[in-house]
Amino acid sequence: MKIKISLLLLAVLCNFSVFAQSDFDKYFEKKSLRVDFALSGNLKSQSAAIQQLREEPVWGGPVKNLIDKSGYGGYYINVYDKATNKLIYSRGFNTLFEEWRSTEQAKTETQSWTNSASVPFPKTPVYIEITARDKADMQFHPLLKQEVDPKSIFIDRG
């Protein structure tokens, strides 16, 4: 009886693994899209702008658990399928810019800091969104949302 339950549990877990993998394969290539972006601002406000998109030959991130539900980090990078507006990838992260915004200098100066994040390379057009946590309500609010076509001539293929 224990063997039957163990085999059934193993079969169920294998099926979940196959479905998670197929979701990756449905939306992404096995390579990376590096998103170089600037975070600019001061203590009171901030904004973001994409500086460069670069195709990289290998995806070293997860192929399962593509949506980060942890809520950790001061920022999130989200990827939405353009056709359905479905969230297909997300990751939380922190930056030195976020720490700098808490300094005395940020009360009187505005600065811009360059950052990079890698996402799986999409097969079809997507929206890339960068959100920031608002310390007042602890919710994430969008800093930018930009359409990215994987066939674009503006993606550095070098």
What are these regions (language model features)?
Residues 69-92:
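Extended low-complexity, serine/threonine- and proline-enriched intrinsically disordered segments
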Residues 107-158:
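Extended acidic/polar, glycine-enriched regions
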Residues 88-108, 144-147:
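Solvent-exposed serine/threonine-rich low-complexity stretches and specific carbohydrate-binding patches
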Residues 1-24:
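Bacterial Sec-dependent N-terminal signal peptides
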Residues 38, 80, 131-133:
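Structured loops at beta-to-helix junctions and adjacent beta-edge loops in soluble globular domains
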Residues 23, 28-68:
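Short amphipathic, basic-aromatic surface patches that mediate peripheral association
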Residues 28, 59, 68-73, 110-112, ...:
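Short, surface-exposed loop/turn motifs at beta-strand boundaries within globular domains
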Residues 9, 24, 66-68, 106-108, ...:
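Residues embedded in well-ordered secondary-structure elements
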